[in-house]
Regions:
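Juxtamembrane transmembrane-helix boundary motif
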Residues: 80, 94-122, 129, 133-142, ...
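Conserved phosphate/ATP/ADP-binding segment of small-molecule kinases
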Residues: 120-178
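Short glycine-enriched, charge-decorated loop/helix-capping segments at active-site entrances
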Residues: 49-56, 115-120, 149-153
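Glycine- and other small-residue-rich loops at beta-strand/loop junctions that grip anionic moieties
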Residues: 13, 79-80, 115, 176
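Glycine-rich anion/phosphate-binding loops
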Residues: 15-19, 82-93, 117-121
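Conserved N-terminal subdomain of the carbohydrate kinase-like
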Residues: 2-9, 29-105, 109-112
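Glycine/serine-rich anion-binding loops at beta->alpha junctions
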Residues: 7-29
Length: 178
């Protein structure tokens, strides 16, 4: 990412600041760029786990994306937690209105404490429609296992899972160790 880039983050809010939109804002700002946000859910969480998840209405997610991008055209979009198929549909629809070549998807599915953050219908839609739009997909090991229906224990398993994600339609894959 070039300094002074404008990045739209579409993700959940983490009350502890360790993940989600808060972590993305810190990273983008530290790299000298400008962060904009569209919040998909508000979570009450800390380092020990997730207490609650409050979804933002789909229409408001769509409005946040389009209204922000109408004024400040993003150079890149980073997508995190999309908790339902309706949210994924709204994000796909909004992306069709925004011409951005750099789309990074971090398919947030499981919180560090183990709480599931996305339903099976949404996982299937993510695989069928959204992954192929991404410049880069960055699942962690548990997320890559869910997306590919494989078990990852060794580096070779990560490579196999990355190839399966490319078969699904991903352009580039970075499987994180977490």
């Amino acid at each position: 990412m070039k300094p002074n880039s404008k990045v739209l983050i579409i993700a959940g809010s983490d009350s502890s600041g360790g993940a989600g939109i808060q972590a993305d804002i810190k990273t983008i700002t530290a790299l000298g760029s400008y962060a904009m946000t569209a919040i998909t859910a508000i979570t009450a969480q800390n380092t020990t786990g997730v207490k609650s998840i409050v979804p933002i209405p789909v229409k408001e997610i769509f409005n946040q994306i389009l209204f922000t991008a109408k004024d400040i055209k993003p150079d890149a979009i980073k997508i995190g937690m999309l908790h339902s198929s309706k949210v994924i549909d709204a994000v796909i629809k909004s992306l069709e209105s925004i011409n951005v070549n750099k789309l990074v998807i971090d398919p947030v599915m499981v919180a560090k404490g183990g709480a599931k953050l996305i339903d099976n219908k949404a996982i299937n839609l993510l695989k069928k429609k959204l992954i192929k739009k991404a410049s880069l997909i960055t699942p962690n090991i548990p997320e890559a296992e869910i997306l590919t229906n494989t078990t990852i224990r060794r580096n070779e398993d990560m490579i196999f899972a990355a190839h399966k994600l490319i078969e699904i339609g991903a352009n580039n894959v970075l499987i994180k160790g977490g």
